[in-house]
Amino acid sequence: GCDTILAGFVGEDYHCRSLKEKLLENKIDDVGLVPTNRPTTTKMRIIGGHQQMMRLDFESTEPLEKIYIDKFLAFVRCKLAESIDAIVVSDYAKGTCSEVTTTAIIEAAHAHGVPVIIDPKGANWTKYRGADYITPNIKEINELLLDPIKNTDAEVLKAAHYIMRKYRIKNVLVTRSESGVTLVREGEEVHIPTRAQEVFDVSGAGDTVIAVLAAGLAGGLKGRDAAFLANLAASVVVRKLGTYAVSREELKEALRGLSREEA
């Protein structure tokens, strides 16, 4: 894996303590978690018969107070001044990734030459303007567009080019479920097919894509190669029940299992 720092907002509650315990177990720095007067956003999945029956959300989406935002951004800028190779902004529309915070993160990262990779949410993509990568799925693209698209190569390419032009985003990586992923950048369009397999649970597949993409870019891979690796990692994750973190060895095994044509 890579050295990872988590930054965001939490409450002073059980779910925050539980989160910090998990971070400690996985050797992830939690110093960027800013305590607030709101609950820690928590998603509880109810599983029955190996299927998700429902999900309970514990959250507040009210605007954050300026004092908390200032602490959060000060931390991000401090870390950028030290040594950060990539930033992932994962927007869940819970209040953290507002236009103020997201714009400030992109500007600060670019001042240090650090790429920003966005996992979008909602219809306001103005706040993502200027990002280096964005990784929407078809549903997220359709939440943005007035005229929804189908999951075809032609329509995905058209939507990706629109996103690049309108929001000045350099690279668009569209995750397309059974159709794999499509990477679009200036002068390049790449379709990377998924690998045939049995799918147990798609929970966390998109998170896997953006995490492995960021790790690859931070490690010096070209966009096309990082996207290929991210797609391969997602193919491992969807074979597992529940959210799952793919290991280095599992990724190596998946690479060894590729045919010469796929490689």
Can you say where each PLM-predicted feature lies in the sequence?
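Conserved phosphate-binding/catalytic loop of the ribokinase/pfkB sugar-kinase fold
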Residues: 33-38, 45-82
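Short acidic, glycine-rich surface-loop motifs adjacent to enzyme active sites
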Residues: 80-96
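Conserved post-catalytic alpha-helical subdomain immediately downstream of the catalytic base
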Residues: 170, 195-258
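Substrate-binding N-lobe of the ribokinase-like
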Residues: 1-42, 254-257
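Glycine-rich phosphate/adenosyl-contacting loop at the front of the ribokinase-like
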Residues: 1-5, 193, 198-200, 260-263
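Conserved phosphate/ATP/ADP-binding segment of small-molecule kinases
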Residues: 94-189
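A structural signal for isolated positions on well-ordered beta-strands in alpha/beta enzyme cores
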Residues: 5-8, 32, 86-88, 117, ...
